[in-house]
Structure formats: C-alpha cells, structure tokens
Amino acid sequence: MKNYLLLCGGVGGAKLALGFKNSIDSDNLTIAVNTGDDFTHLGLRICPDLDTVMYTLASESDTSKGWGRKDESWNMLSALSEMEGETWFQLGDKDLATHIQRTHLINSGQSLTDATHNLCESFNLPKFIFPMSNQSVETYIQTKNRLLSFQEYFVKLKCEPPVTDFVFKGLDKADFNKDLDLSTYDEIIICPSNPYVSINPMLQLPKLKNYLHDYSHNVTTISPIVNAQSLKGPTAKMMQELGQEVSVKTIAKFYNNYSQRIFIDSSDVSESDALNDLGYEVHITDLIMNS
C-alpha cells in the first residue's frame, strides 16, 4: 500500500482528507495542514484549518456552515456580547473548549504537533494530522490601502477588500514540520485548497519547497477550480483581483515547479491539451465532493 501525504487547507482539503481516511488504512495517510491562518484571539491560540480538518475527520463539523462544530451552542459568545467584548470571530461553546485545551497544552510546553495529537486523541482520531510547522508563520493580505492579518481580511472584512499581494511573516525562523520525513511518502497530494493562502504558506517552507521541486514526479495536484469558479472560499475572487484568468490552467501554472500530475473536473476537459503542454499528466474526473 502506498503512503500518502496530503498538503491541506480548510474545507476543500478536509473533504478530500475525509475521502482518503475512508478509503485507505490510517497508517498510510498523513495530513500536513496550513497554519498560516493561526492567530491568538482573546488569549487563545486558534488554528482554523487544523480544527476544520480534525472536526471533519471526526464527523464533528458543522457542514451547514463549513466551519465549527455540529450541534453547537453560543452561550459564551452571547455573554461576551453583553459585555461589549470582541465577537467578530465567532467561537461556539464546544469549539471554545478546543482552543482552551490547545492553549493550555502549548503553555505547558507542548509543541503544536503534540498539542494537535492530544486533541486528535480526544476525538478518537489517529495521530495523522500535523501542522505544517511548529514555528509560527502568519499570512497577511496586502490590499491597496493597508496590510491585513488573514482573519481580519477573511472573517472581519468578509474578503471584501481587493487583494494585491500576500505576505508571510515568520519564515526566517520556520521550516516544514521536522516530524515528517518527506522521503517516506510514495505520493504527495496538493489538496483543492486555496493556492494563495492555504498551500502557498507551505510552499514557502524551504524543506518542503525544495523537496517538491526535486521530486515533482511524485506530486499530484487536485484543482480547486471547476468550470471557471472556486467551489469554496475566495480563490476565484483573488485570481481576478491579481489579474489572473480563473481557470485550471492558472492553477497548473502556479504549481508547475512542484507537480507533474493534475486532476481536473470533467467540465474542464477542454483545458487538457494546454495542461499537457505545461508538462502535466492530466486525469479527468468529477471533482465536486459532497460530504
């Protein structure tokens, strides 16, 4: 059986990870998750993509919202609102317990990897979810007027300001998770997550970037674009604002130095020749995942 490493963001990546979890032995699956979205809020360390993956794989996610836990209550947030506290980032009561426990574990001296694995055990999951790095890397969104932290852009401002660039802070002190030996994986999968803010933070980490470049024949990309639109999140909007065509060809060009195989949706079959010309082995299937 092959060993797979998934490079994963939030909702779209989590759906693919769930498919792998349900299809192969957990011993053959590792999921490295973007932590560029992580931030400290109300004194708590919050890891949105790690939590989305963990909740999804534990069948605990709120599928109607695409984030948070199912059967959630909001007593803390309601009480905080009455105190005129910060409520722009919505924390449900059960979700809050995750952030409290993570923060406690990290403050007790655990690495983010160890804290993540402790949380996985609480959700009866194998220890196959890893943060991309144990060092902090923070994604910022450059707009025309100012630089925004990712959560300020994504949640507080609802992705409204036009994007001009991306900035990743902390790269001088960070690298890909040292607990993951890239040479042990037969295939690396780039999940259908936002290439700019979910996958690109990982590609900035030298250990991973160099490995993908040298072993691109072992790397498969799953397109997050289907029929000229993104199924989740602001990927298509960002492409347009950056002056890029919203297409699988743009995705292929973005990953061209790191991947030699790509899966595209059957609605994009007309793009196959252009992807072949870029050097890709193209696979066509139905990419929309319902879970």
Language-model features: locations:
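Redox- and metal-dependent alpha/beta enzyme cores, enriched for Fe-S-associated oxidoreductases
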Residues: 203-242
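A short helix->loop->beta-strand "cap" motif at the edges of active sites that frequently abuts
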Residues: 25-27, 214-219, 280
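Short Gly/Thr/Asp-enriched flexible loops that form oxyanion-binding sites at enzyme active sites
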Residues: 17-21, 198-211
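C-terminal functional extensions of proteins
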Residues: 232-291
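Electropositive, gly/pro-rich neighborhoods at or near active sites that engage anionic ligands
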Residues: 33-170
